[in-house]
């Protein structure tokens, strides 16, 4: 049972983020005996909720991302307290009375987690905050968000049935979204800035079979319209032209949600991903990171594995303290 002191709920471990890494970490942590809380700013599942079909997660020949997310959450909820729609605003570390403000973070001090609802205290933290969609950064992108511009075909594809859409990008996400939209009955074209796709060969073959056209060596420079998207400005090998479209689906990668790392001086790489060792430990004692926020191979099964490793490392470090 958790204790209360000075109105702060106290835990052994707080997991921040309810994607595959966070949910798995929470399961492993509680099963090892750690009093654990999971905090998720939205709903559990993360990007899983946007994946229309998964065919490489062991145990399921085919499953939707939303269904897998639901099963992971249901499993975790049997073990751990989950608080959704609660965003972590600030991380800090309590200093003992004999510690000077200039001292580095103490290895024995508790962490204070301040959210939109209350504050919590924990002996250890696992950061599993994932990533967010990278933006094109062009005129009209923000203006028409929700009015023709989208980052999630699974979420918004239904509204574009029998309409003209483009998918911007050349990786697995772009290919998957294009195929989903094609199956929804959309008139789909892929716009890619290079002369070949980065998506896996299996997805490329599916794109070919679906006869989805691709504009090679092309970039979106502007999104235009009145109340909704009406066309995009494309540059292809220096030549500029307008293409009439009803929807623009952006799939050009992700940016790590690692802003909380700066609160504790947690090391990040040049791209903003949290740096960890092979046991998911960061440079700050009793702080761990797992899943997409720590970079590496961004796959669901890898995120789950990293979450499990992080929880085991946390258990080892907490129980080894005198």
Task: Give the positions of each predicted feature.
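Beta1-alpha1 glycine-rich phosphate/pyrophosphate-binding loop at the start
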Residues: 7-79, 163, 173-200, 215
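Phosphate-coordination loops involved in phosphoryl transfer and adenosine-cofactor binding
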Residues: 10, 85, 161-163, 217, ...
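Conserved phosphate-binding and hydrolysis motifs of nucleotide-dependent enzymes
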Residues: 17-22, 130, 169-171, 291
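A Rossmann-like FAD-binding core segment of flavoenzymes
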Residues: 76-96, 107-114, 119-122, 182-278, ...
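Glycine/small-residue-rich loop that forms an oxyanion/phosphate-binding "nest" at active or ligand-binding sites
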Residues: 82-94, 111-115, 119-159
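FAD-site-proximal beta/loop scaffold in flavoenzymes
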Residues: 132, 137, 143-159, 252-302, ...
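A charged, well-structured terminal subsegment
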Residues: 308-322
